[in-house]
């Protein structure tokens, strides 16, 4: 069996045709993996994909400003509304990263961003309610998988299975 991480990079929906990341249709394919980094930040490319899809009305079941996004806002000191305004102006990934870096509160060093990203990538459910939700989806999607431990593992599995992959 291929590893989830290698399989996720080519989900069935994306492999069937090119994906337009400037206007992603999240009814046809998932956003980028939460592990994908931009400027050292994990989750930022995924957050951008969801924001662009919401702006285009093609977000499907994906939510902008979900609890995972809120952890990014908490670390950066940014707010979802002004960030969405930048997305709606058609900013590129690089321009959105420049916006993030210019508006960090407090300012963060590259080593702080790297440390936060490493920490965030390893986060697992931390209370009974979130653990129950996590376990329910894990059980439904791939109960036999023993390597699904973190929220990022869970998101990648859910995205992959939702868009036609076999766990």
Describe the residue ranges of each PLM region.
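Amphipathic alpha-helical packing elements
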Residues: 59-100
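Intrinsically disordered, low-structural-confidence terminal and linker regions
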Residues: 2-14
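Polar/charged low-complexity regulatory segments
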Residues: 11-59, 119-167
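Short alpha-helical interface patches
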Residues: 70, 80-88, 114, 153-160, ...
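Amphipathic protein-protein interaction modules
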Residues: 83, 87-142
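Generic alpha-helical structural element
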Residues: 33-36, 40, 61, 72, ...
């Amino acid at each position: 069996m291929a590893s989830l991480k290698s399989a996720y990079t080519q989900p069935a929906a994306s492999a069937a045709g090119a994906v337009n990341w400037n206007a992603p249709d999240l009814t046809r394919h998932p956003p980028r993996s939460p592990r994908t980094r931009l400027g050292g930040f994990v989750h930022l490319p995924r957050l951008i994909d969801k924001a662009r899809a919401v702006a285009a009305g093609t977000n499907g079941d994906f939510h902008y400003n979900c609890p995972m996004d809120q952890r990014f806002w908490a670390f950066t000191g940014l707010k979802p509304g002004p960030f969405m305004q930048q997305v709606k102006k058609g900013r590129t990934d690089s321009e959105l990263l420049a916006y993030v870096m210019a508006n960090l509160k407090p300012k963060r060093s590259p080593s702080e961003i790297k440390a936060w990203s490493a920490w965030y990538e390893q986060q697992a459910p931390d209370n009974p309610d979130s653990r129950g939700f996590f376990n329910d989806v894990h059980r439904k999607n791939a109960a036999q998988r023993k390597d699904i431990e973190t929220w990022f593992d869970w998101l990648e599995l859910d995205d992959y299975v939702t868009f036609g992959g076999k766990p």
